[in-house]
């Protein structure tokens, strides 16, 4: 079995392809990436403490319903971390690297996942199965520099 560098995004993408995960879509086009960001999320920088604030758009959008997710991310977003939320149980799983993300994807095959690369490494994972909603987000320095 091939081994993948858990901290290298390119190795994660290769591992996903090798695993043949049908529920994972890798979005590499700048145009598509921006459309996804525009569709789902409003970003604003708080200049006083450099936190990134995330506001999910449209009350009908599934992401907007995850108020616990918003609360955690607004209060304590950590650069380079991935967040997975279970809405019903109000639990938050913080993942440290791409390897951990891949492990979650392999064990939750019913989730629909979108991975955006480069400027904003951004993972959206959502399912309504069993009344649970998962959302994962990574914040990174490239995004801060890109938006300012």
Residue ranges of predicted features:
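Structured alpha/beta or helical-core interaction and ligand-binding surfaces enriched in interleaved
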Residues: 1-131, 137-148
